[in-house]
Structure formats: structure tokens, C-alpha cells
Regions:
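Subset of outer-membrane beta-barrel
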Residues: 4-180
Length: 180
């Protein structure tokens, strides 16, 4: 008896070859504050604070203080690499009881990396980095519902043009958020 299948033998064994993760600027998803990070990234469900831009900027209209400033520093993956870190600066200001503005600056330093070719020849050392600037406006829509619009500029310099065909990357993004 011969059985035939359309599957590749390696796929039947669960081996499909390299599975490269191609997430662009993954530093954007790292929680900037110790509280949110220690609670499993659940900052969406917490009380409004200056770090709300990362979770939902529509929360800013529910801020208790008129103005907040926050500064955060996280040594990232310290057990693996000793010089990779995330720095975060946040500012939020309630214009009145119904609206607020906020801005953040996020800087991610990948540490010092030695670039080599396929033969192991060194092509210099470099400190790859990425950063993003966010600006948001939030407005109360009802007593329990608010909305916001936010814009973001993203900069990524991971290779310093040391890799053929590579260049600095940058992008802009916009978000619309609702909070109930």
C-alpha cells in the first residue's frame, strides 16, 4: 500500500527551515515604565499616568493632576547583554477638564556591536540605536468616554550603512484611540 501526501517530508517533521522574525522597530512595544512592565504589560487596564501614551493616549483626559512629567530607564535583557537600554521621557498636560496634550521621547540603545563579514573580518564597531517621538491630543467625549489622535516619528539606525544595501530607516505613524 502506498500513501501519498502533498506535504513535504520536512514539514511533517515540523522543520520548515529558518523562521526569521521580521518585526519592524520592536522597541516600540517595550513597556517604558516599571509598573506596566512588572504587571505583564497590562497598562491599558491601570489608572491614568504620564506613561499612558504607550498604552492608550485617550486616557490622558482622566488624569488627576494638571501636569505630569516622567523619566524612565530600563536596562534591557541585562542578563544577556550588559549595554542595551531603553530611556523614556514623557510629558502630559491637561488643558482643561475636557482635553489634554502629551508628548514622549523614547530612545533605545542596542549596545556596542562589532560588525564582521562572512569570513570573520571586523568592519568596525557601532552602537545601533532607534528612537521615536510621539505627540497626542485627547478629548473627553462623555463622562466616561474619551478619544485621542496621536502622531509618531520613528528613526532606526541599526547598521550605520556598514551592511551593503542598508540605510537609516525612518517613518511616521498616526493612531486614533478610544477609552471607556
Amino acid at each position: 500500500v502506498v500513501a501519498q501526501s502533498g506535504s513535504n517530508y520536512n514539514e511533517l517533521l515540523g522543520q520548515r527551515g529558518p523562521n526569521v522574525i521580521t518585526t519592524a522597530v520592536p522597541f516600540i512595544s517595550i513597556s517604558p515604565d516599571a509598573r506596566g512592565g512588572s504587571m505583564g504589560e497590562c497598562g491599558v487596564a491601570t489608572e491614568t499616568d504620564v506613561y499612558s501614551m504607550h498604552y492608550n493616549p485617550a486616557k490622558y483626559t482622566f488624569m488627576k493632576d494638571r501636569m505630569s512629567i516622567g523619566l524612565g530607564y530600563s536596562p534591557w535583557l541585562r542578563n544577556l547583554v550588559d549595554d542595551m537600554n531603553l530611556a523614556y521621557l514623557a510629558f502630559a498636560y491637561k488643558l482643561n477638564n475636557e482635553s489634554a496634550i502629551a508628548a514622549t521621547l523614547r530612545y533605545f540603545n542596542c549596545g556596542e556591536i562589532t560588525y564582521t563579514d562572512e569570513y570573520g573580518t571586523s568592519h568596525g564597531e557601532f552602537r545601533p540605536n532607534e528612537w521615536a517621538v510621539d505627540v497626542a491630543y485627547s478629548r473627553m467625549l462623555t463622562d466616561y468616554l474619551s478619544g485621542s489622535v496621536a502622531g509618531r516619528f520613528i528613526y532606526s539606525n541599526l547598521t550605520q550603512n556598514l551592511v551593503d544595501g542598508s540605510s537609516v530607516g525612518w517613518s511616521v505613524a498616526a493612531d486614533v484611540a478610544v477609552y471607556y
